[in-house]
Amino acid sequence: MIVDKLLDDSRGGEGLLDAAGDCGLMTSPLNLAYFYGASPPAAAPGACDGGCSASGPSAPGSPGSDSSDFSSASSVSSCGAVESRPRGGARAERLQVEPHMGVVRQQRGPFQGVRVKNSVKELLLHIRSHKQKASGQAVDDFKTQSVNREQFTELKNTVSYSGKRKGSDSLSDGPACKRSALLHTQFLTPPQTPTPAESMEDVHHNESKQDSCADLLQNIINIKNECSPVSLNTVQVSWMSPGEVPQGSPHEQCQDLHRGQVFSPPQKYQPFQVSSSPHMMDQASMYQYSPQNQSVQPPPQHYTHNPALEYSPYSRTSQSPSYEPHLFGREPQFCPDQSFAPLLSDPRQSENIAVPPQTAPSVQQQIDTHLQNFSLMPPDTCEALARPDASSTPLSTPLPFPNLGGNPMSTTQLGKSFFQWQVEQEENKLANISQDQFLSKDADGDTFLHIAVAQGRRALSYVLARKMNALHMLDIKEHNGQSAFQVAVAANQHLIVQDLVTLGAQVNTTDCWGRTPLHVCAEKGHSQVLQAIQKGAAGSNQFVDLEATNYDGLTPLHCAVLAHNAVVHELQRNQQPHSPEVQELLLKNKSLVDTIKCLIQMGAAVEAKDRKSGRTALHLAAEEANLELIRLFLELPSCLSFVNAKAYNGNTALHVAASLQYRVTQLDAVRLLMRKGADPSTRNLENEQPVHLVPDGPVGEQIRRILKGKSIQQRAPPY
């Protein structure tokens, strides 16, 4: 132990180690035996006697005890005993001993302690700064024995970082005791060499031993390179049987240490591989599948003969209960060399026939084509594969399967529609109905056909209409004078309407109000029914009277315009644009516009006049300032023929539009008529021009200016 603290002796006493400090022969402060042996003959005994007399009972009896068996630990404890005694007693005893030994010391100043500067002190200070609590005697033993124990990190950590030892442990003569090493299963590799960081920390320890460390490090590296590292994450699995020896050199297989899988070199896809084991060839063939994208070889599966796993080409039925459907992408393990013809002719024999497993040679084929276009191989293909040139035989011959349904369906049955099937069912139900029952009516005069049509039962209506048409009673009417065809039109059943017209229903029949089916369609806005009537009438060679009038003298086009005017009027009055009522009115507005367009497309005349007032459709649209319909009519090619048409009172459409009050679109309607050719100078039967019918007010003033042509020139486009 190094004595590094200052001893402040006010009495002028000097320590025992002053003489030793003067000699300058101490090479190691931990090996005191070497210090006593190298001291002068006159000073060593005296110093020893002085030290011995001052140490008391715990000190050795004579200097002769500093032999080879005198440990450094006892020397350190003796020095500690000398320092712990009172300074006065130590000085008195030394003064008595020195005259007796005949030694005269030179008087010096106050004692300042012993300071030794060498690499060992710096090393110990470095160890203390890094919290290495190793004892001094252990370091001395390692130094004197010249044993290099810094090569292995585990042993260094055990010696250096084991903590401060107790007093009883310091008295040991040998090296420090090692802790019992724990069994770590993860350390399956040779001990690792010191890292660069550890070498930087222990640079003072390894300066004198670089050569030996380099040799040891090279030996460890050589040992580590010779042995193949194996970790617990590595899984080496041999799928071969115990009796088989795997073929191939170690270079043909590479181990994936991270995933623990054994990979084979990339090769082409082989759907069938023959096992190299002779005894396995007799039992079953080895099946091995190796996709190209993963290059992983799963274990070849060995199949033995099992009646429950026999192959059968039929589906799971009572005739072949042993069939189990193979998984997607799995190939057939067996390739029978006998024909499937007996099985196809007699399915009951499939239970008693055992297909012997055979081995097929390797066939080169792409994996995608094999998985997607997979087909079972017939026996002729298996025979071809059994030949030596089977590697070039494609697996493209499909296996014919019998009809599993048992009852083959004819072409007519396959082409039957659902409606035809429903008609057959209804005919079977009405097979026992008499003619009187077909023609019977209820209290309202409705027959079975009227009720079926109102309910929308198309198949039943078709069967009833066909039976009643055979009796020439298809147009029989109920109490309102409506036939079944008119009921279907009012119910918006366009499919039933087309069926009835095809069977021969009259399209121009009228009800008790003089309305034809076209009037009903125009009033309700059933544009699809109009198209069905047109199509059915063309098929049955019937004439559709588009100019037929009801008892009010209105044609279907007039009725449609009046219905649309009512919707426009309601829309102008309603101030809530997003209310449900407004949404319903908008839908009805659209359907009515479509109906009017359909009527015009069918050939309805816009210039046709009603029977009571002589008004045209343009007059009716001008009465409500219906800009949408006015624009629709005036965009027709024949608009000039009816734009100035007069009613029975002599009024034109411009007279009607100019005389309106409290209409939002009145100004726009008058302007539109003037632009499309309306004559503002036309007079009615009362000799009135449109300007004479304009009401007073700010809107009237603007209308007058438009009628006089002043604002027309200002608003005219530049072209």
From Swiss-Prot:
Region called Required for transcriptional activity, residue ranges: 322-394
ANK repeats by residue range: 444-473, 480-509, 513-542, 552-581, 583-608, 613-642, 649-682
Entry's induction text: By LPS in polymorphonuclear cells, monocytes/macrophages and total lymphocytes, but not in T-lymphocytes (in vitro). By E.coli intramammary injection in peripheral blood leukocytes.
Highest taxon above the source species: Eukaryota
InterPro entries associated with the record: Ankyrin_rpt (IPR002110), Ankyrin_rpt-contain_sf (IPR036770), OCA (IPR047571)
Ranges of Low complexity composition bias in the record: 46-81
Subcellular location: Nucleus
Position of sequence motif Nuclear localization signal: 164-179
OCA domain mapped to chain residues: 108-130
Region annotation Disordered: where it falls in the sequence: 46-97, 188-210, 289-343
Keyword Nucleus found: yes
Assembly behavior: Interacts with NFKB1/p50. Interacts with RELA. Interacts with AKIRIN2.
Name of the protein this chain belongs to: NF-kappa-B inhibitor zeta
